[in-house]
């Protein structure tokens, strides 16, 4: 029995060290060399303080800020999740209708799909350009800014699809809100 057990335990230990320690450390080291910002979490700093991550959404609900997509996990990265409500769920329909009515009342514009539906992770840091543009008038009113200036700021933060092929154009909510704060008012 020991003749079979000893090689099995040695293999288990060796593979555990290889896949549980060596491989993750090697990938972390490679990432730190190739893309140090992303390896560190794409943190955004203001005056030496971390204000957020370009990759993790956070809630903004003031009228002078660009609002993110709804989140089933209240933007909690430790408890990220979707709502688990299916497409035929009456509860999901009621949530979407409630979000749509609130969005249209706040912004005076039709609600784009991403304004009323949560992302799968609940932490999406981006909204669609259409969603951001629809919020421009509300943001301008709340901040006492010219709507055209807010629209220009939003357009300056539109990120194209990856290599022009994959994904969709998107706007990082935190980046726009920090730019709005930097613009004053």
Swiss-Prot record:
It is found in: Cell inner membrane. InterPro entries: KdpC. Keywords: ATP-binding, Cell inner membrane, Cell membrane, Ion transport, Membrane, Nucleotide-binding, Potassium, Potassium transport, Transmembrane, Transmembrane helix, Transport. GO terms for cellular component: plasma membrane. It comes from the Bacteria. Residues 105-128 are annotated as: Disordered. The keyword Nucleotide-binding applies. The chain crosses the membrane at residues 14-34. It is a single-pass membrane protein. It holds the Pfam family KdpC. GO terms for molecular function: ATP binding; P-type potassium transmembrane transporter activity. NCBIfam families: kdpC (TIGR00681), PRK00315.1 (NF001454). The system is composed of three essential subunits: KdpA, KdpB and KdpC. Part of the high-affinity ATP-driven potassium transport (or Kdp) system, which catalyzes the hydrolysis of ATP coupled with the electrogenic transport of potassium into the cytoplasm. This subunit acts as a catalytic chaperone that increases the ATP-binding affinity of the ATP-hydrolyzing subunit KdpB by the formation of a transient KdpB/KdpC/ATP ternary complex. Belongs to the KdpC family. This is Potassium-transporting ATPase KdpC subunit. The gene is kdpC.
